[in-house]
Structure formats: structure tokens, C-alpha cells
Amino acid sequence: MALFMAILGVLVLLLCLCSALLKWNEVRFRRKGLPPGAMGWPVFGETTEFLKQGPNFMKNKRARYGSFFKSHILGCPTIVSMDPELNRFILMNEAKGLVPGYPQSMLDILGTRNIAAVHGSTHKYMRGALLSIISPTLIRDQLLPKIDEFMRTHLMDWDNKVINIQEKTKEMAFLSSLKQIAGMESSSIAQPFMTEFFKLVLGTLSLPINLPRTNYRGGLQARKSIISILSRLLEERKASQDVHVDMLGCLMKKDENRYKLNDEEIIDLVITIMYSGYETVSTTSMMAVKYLHDHPKVLEEIRKEHFAIRERKKPEDPIDCNDLKSMRFTRAVIFETSRLATIVNGVLRKTTHDMELNGYLIPKGWRIYVYTREINYDPFLYHDPLTFNPWRWLGNSLESQSHFLIFGGGTRQCPGKELGIAEISTFLHYFVTRYRWEEVGGDKLMKFPRVVAPNGLHIRVSSFSN
């Protein structure tokens, strides 16, 4: 009996302590003028609930506090914004103190000179360097031919096989990007680079705890290995004096390039290019295959578009820019896939000083999470939003609307948007004109915090001509 009473006393004490901690944390952040919301536990905040409940966490918060509220997620005090017009203001006003606020693990692993980490004049310079190697002219003359050649080869031997389309699109996104960056030399560095790159990606999505066997430690080590691979490639190119028609060759042209980067900046920019395109291109391609399988009328329409292109060409003729421009329905499929699957959940900003926003005080150093998932499913913005309907993007000017944040927004809109669309469009062109496919079944999809098939997404592929 005495033991029972002692245990009961300890439990009551713990309950009181927990209640006091929660109350103290709320009082600590109850400054005059802050948006409504709750801060959860000290240190951990509401991160556990956010990751566990996912979209339901945000829905419940929105129902209780509205479209602009405070929380404590991802390791720091955070304001969550789901208001389309306010989101546009936040993303358009970096100069007013709303700078990128990405997690520390991402900044550490992608490098101090990566385009997501810098702002002001440095960001303008690095973005200019990036845009100079993915301009419409270079996409037309150099990058698209490489993409076409790669996709033809990558999709060559899928007939009569059961494949994991998740793994195939991951390989596709990585290897296609590497070919554009390093040209002919990409084949010699692909395998060691890819092994380390996948570790790097995991590290950016982890807590910044630098202990053995953590994803964060693995990401930091992977970064060192990738720097070694790229540094060796840069030195070999400097020694050879050969002309290389690829992204790396453009970046290394000191005399002809107005954006003169040192080796460290070039390496960080290459890692940024690889990282930025990898997740969006691979996951959008996988989910497009999934949605096309589930919606036969959409598949019929996209096949009609691509067979019309093939009828104008000889079998060996590559895709060119005029073909890309004619892929209006394919572009709509890509946008609708990105919207419905919500490949990117939101964008993070950080305040550089105390400021007023939407009538509330936002303290210096707080994160602002422009949460786009709920906007993608807003029935006032998208009719019947949970239905996969690419036709909604044809002739409705949705791409020019302020709530269109699938590729980011404001001064940080994804500079590689058109290049990514070109890669996915070319992949879909050869996939739907060469093959039929059916799902093997039993594979599950998770859509939060990332879109992923934990056990893969397996499909049985056969030749379309059969």
C-alpha cells in the first residue's frame, strides 16, 4: 500500500510539473501583439505533434486560430501563414527583413554559399551565376539534347520487368542532372557521387545532432566526400585545358563569364543544383506515373499529345524546344501532380528584426512558415480540389495567380523551374509512348513530411506496341 501511494505521489508530481512547464512556456511567449496560438513544451515545442499528425495538425490549428498563428515547430518559435495574399507579401519582401530561414542541418550540409542560405547582394550574384547556366538558350542548345539522350537510354530496357518506379526516378533525376553538369565525365564519377549524395539528402532532413550514426553526421561526411570528388574534377579540368560544353565548363570560364566564382562557390552551386532538382523531379515523375495509372482518361489524353509529336518525327529524332512548347497538357499534368501530391509543403523565412505583419508583432529571429499544402486544397481556389484534374490548368491562368506557389514565389521562385519541367516532360514522353504499366499492388504512399513510398512503388512494365 505504501509503495502504491509513493508511485501515485510521483505520478501526481510529474503531472503537476508537466502542467507547470506547459503553463510557463505559454506565459514566456505571451507577448503583447503576438498572433494567437500555442507553444507546446519547452525546447521541443509542438514538433512531435506536427510530425506525427502532419496535415491534420495544421488543419486543427487553422480551425482554432485562423490562417495566421504562432507555434514552436522544427526547433524554434514559428509563425505559420496560410493566407495567399499575405504569403505573397512575405515572399516578395526579403529586402524588408524576411530572409530565408531554412533548418540548420540543411545550411550546414549544403554549404555556406548555397543559394538558399545567402541573401542580399550575395544571393543576387549567386542566383545570376545559376541563371546564366540554365537560361532558355542553354536549355535549347545544350541541356535539352543531353536530357533527351539520357532519357532514351535510361528507359531503354524496362520492357517485361517489374520495376520500383521510386528508385528508377531517383536514379533518373540524379544521373540526368549530373550529365548536364559534368558531361562525358559524369559516367566515371556517377556511382561514388550518387552513394554519397543520397546520404547528404538524408542529412539535410535531420536534427542537427552531430553524433555517430546519425543522419546529420552522415550528411556532413557525405558533403566532405562530394567536395573531394568535385575538387578532383575541377583540378583535372584545369590541367587538361580541354573545352567542356556543360554547366561546369560554363562556370569555369573566367574570361567569358561575368559571374566569376572561386572553386568553393562552384562546388556549393553544383551541390545546390543537384539537391534542388533531385527531390522535385524524381518525386513528381513518380507521382505522375501513379496518377496516370489511376486516371485512364488523363493517360489517354497525354498519350494523344505525345504520339502526335512522334508522328512528326523520325524514330531517332530527339525532342526539341518546339516540342516542349507544344506539350500543353503534359505541363498541366505536371502542375496538377505537384499540387495534389504537394511535393513541397511550404517555404521558410526568418525575421532579421522585430516587425509588424498582418497587424501582429513578429519578434526578431522567429521563423515564418509559408505553408502551401492547405492552399493547394482550398476549394475557393481550386474547384473540387481533391480530384486529379489537369484540365483545370488549361486556359484558366492559374499559373499566374498569387496563390500559385508550387515552385516557390517572390524573389526566391525556383530558378530551375523550366529545366525541371523539361526533364519531367521528356521522361513522360518516352515512358508513355513506349510502355504500358500496371501496379503490382500492396505499396503504400506517405505524403507527409515528404512524399515517399516506404517500401517502394512497384509496377509491371510491358511494351506499348504489344
From Swiss-Prot:
For the ligand (heme), the binding residues are C414
Pfam families attached to this UniProt entry: p450
What are the protein's UniProt keywords? Heme, Iron, Membrane, Metal-binding, Monooxygenase, Oxidoreductase, Transmembrane, Transmembrane helix
Presence of the UniProt keyword ATP-binding in the record: no
Q: List the disulfide bonds.
A: none
What's its job? Answer: Catalyzes the C6-oxidation step in brassinosteroids biosynthesis.
- The identity of this protein, by name, is Cytochrome P450 85A
| Gene name of the record | CYP85A
